[in-house]
Amino acid sequence: MGKVLMVLYDGGSHAKDQPGLLGTTENELGIRKWIEEQGHTLVTTSDKDGENSTFDKELVDAEVIITTPFHPGYLTAERLAKAKNLKLAVTAGIGSDHVDLDAANKTNGGITVAEVTGSNVVSVAEHVVMTILLLVRNFVPAHDQIRNGDWNVAAVAKNEFDLENKVVGTVGVGRIGERVLRRLKPFDCKELLYYDYQPLRPEVEKEIGARRVDSLEEMVSQCDVVTINCPLHEKTRGLFNKELISKMKPGSWLVNTARGAIVVKEDVAEALKSGHLRGYGGDVWFPQPAPKEHPLRYAEHPWGGGNATVPHMSGTSIDAQIRYANGTKAILDSYFSGRFDYQPQDLIVHGGDYATKAYGQREKK
């Protein structure tokens, strides 16, 4: 039987306090016993960076790898070339950009890459709306005042606004983007916009009150708030660079819970420090964990605040962890049993070809 390699983050005492932290090395998605009962070996580690990492050493003869977007084991072409037995790569969560998908298609006759589609879309959508409110209402510096023993209403109120009557736009209107728009509807925004290659159904557009904009540059120029909810692929990497940010409405807010590499971190930091952006919030970084010197850890608006960044947590609530742990087990069961009856929406690449358009328009190579 085969070896399963699981790359997760360490939970330490927190994993003991909260058994629901399934996405930790201590709790192993709650499936160690089940995997071993199937006759397989499970190796779990958080050590994933560098040539001498446990990840690199154990990957060589692993048949299955499981990792998460929150502590991704990056499956580069170089690593895949060394993984002679690898047949299945599972993302416990959503987003498989940590895998070189073109290389996966050409390795070992085609490695199947699957993720637990839909497992944390509600979690992320809620986090997006929360972050928008934190930024627009200038909550973070106000809370810092209280913690620091200060009290200066004017200092925080001068950069505090209402979400009502603002224009909000999402880049990407898939499972997360649509849910963000639905949750924003009760706030009576002036307009809800979206940019995506695939439009919403007319009845959904009408129900939400959303409008599609054909040009990304046109959309961001109209928005008070822009939220990024698209996958990372070759066409979205570095999408929010100095040029695109310069087209955003002066004093607007940018929220990114998609992937860190979709924005050019230095350009976002500079736009925030100059005041062109009133605020930036997000939980995604590249690489992850974010280095201590990452500029978006510290960048602020000239008036203070404007930074609502956190570790990659939006999609890993306790509720989400239950869903993606169960979904991971279902994918493994499909593989171990030899049925290979995966849910179509969970497949990213399979049989040496792309199973979805979510990662860009590609041709089989």
From Swiss-Prot:
Keywords annotated in UniProt: Cytoplasm, NAD, Oxidoreductase
Binding site for substrate: I94, N120
Alphabetized Gene3D superfamilies for the sequence: NAD(P)-binding Rossmann-like Domain
Stated family: Belongs to the D-isomer specific 2-hydroxyacid dehydrogenase family. FDH subfamily.
Subunit composition and interactions: Homodimer.
Entry function: Catalyzes the NAD(+)-dependent oxidation of formate to carbon dioxide. Formate oxidation is the final step in the methanol oxidation pathway in methylotrophic microorganisms. Has a role in the detoxification of exogenous formate in non-methylotrophic organisms.
Protein name as annotated: Formate dehydrogenase
Organism: Emericella nidulans (strain FGSC A4 / ATCC 38163 / CBS 112.46 / NRRL 194 / M139) (Aspergillus nidulans)
Recorded name of the encoding gene: aciA
